[in-house]
């Protein structure tokens, strides 16, 4: 089952809608926060609502938190692992690649209670053939120093603010990005073309590549999946961001 987020307020979860969707066959809820592609994050009220659902239904949770260290404006990441009840029911997934700029290494981890972890390993052994041992040793040594990941929010927030300020001087309308290194932008003042078509136009005619948000929907081509939104990635050198902004000013 799916429980669509609400775009007003900004991509928030309607927890009553989630609760209403849970039936007798529901075993697990999957969450992704900080959220790709919207950049939305959870707050304490979300954890309160989720606790209430878990307490009532006993449903298990799979929480994709790979952007856990990329949250902005001084707000902490609201991890499910911070609440004992949620932690008892959760598989919390994260990524060394996102945290340490090593996405090509494909090294991540899962935190779960012993009983859940044992079940996960039964599946994992058939899904993953091998992970590079040298890279795991390198990460184990590097993560002993917390400074690199503690500095991530300020590092990426500066880039987020740079892109947002630049887009403000274009016909794009940047949306809030409280987490991740992605930002959505509304292009409805430019054209009403479908998102995939507009993304293709930007790449071919302006040399700036974006992702159509409709690509993340169950049926990307459906009219209800197109909201004139594209996703920018600001995990780039400042010079690259500035060059992109200059090109987008002419769109």
Question: Positions of the model-derived regions?
Answer:
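PLP-dependent class I/II
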Residues: 1-251
């Amino acid at each position: 089952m799916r429980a669509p987020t609400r775009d007003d307020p900004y991509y928030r979860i309607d927890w009553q809608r989630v609760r209403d969707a849970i039936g007798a066959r529901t075993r697990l809820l999957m969450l992704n926060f900080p959220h790709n592609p919207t950049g939305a994050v959870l707050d304490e009220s979300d954890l309160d609502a989720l606790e209430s659902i878990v307490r009532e239904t006993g449903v298990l949770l799979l929480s994709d938190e790979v952007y856990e260290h990329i949250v902005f404006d001084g707000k902490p990441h609201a991890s499910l692992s911070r609440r004992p009840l949620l932690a008892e029911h959760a598989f919390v997934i994260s990524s060394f690649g996102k945290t340490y700029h090593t996405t090509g290494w494909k090294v991540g981890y899962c935190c779960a209670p012993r009983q859940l972890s044992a079940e996960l390993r039964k599946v994992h052994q058939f899904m993953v053939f091998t992970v590079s041992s040298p890279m795991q040793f390198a990460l184990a040594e590097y993560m002993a120093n917390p400074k690199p990941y503690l500095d991530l929010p300020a590092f990426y927030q500066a880039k987020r603010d740079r892109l947002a300020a630049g887009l403000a001087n274009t016909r794009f309308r940047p949306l809030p990005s409280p987490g991740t290194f992605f930002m959505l932008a509304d292009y409805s003042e430019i054209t009403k073309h479908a998102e995939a078509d507009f993304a293709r136009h930007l790449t071919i005619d302006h040399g700036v590549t974006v992702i159509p948000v409709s690509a993340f929907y169950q049926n990307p081509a459906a009219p209800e999946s197109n909201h004139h939104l594209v996703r920018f990635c600001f995990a780039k050198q400042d010079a690259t961001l500035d060059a992109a902004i200059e090109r987008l000013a002419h769109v």
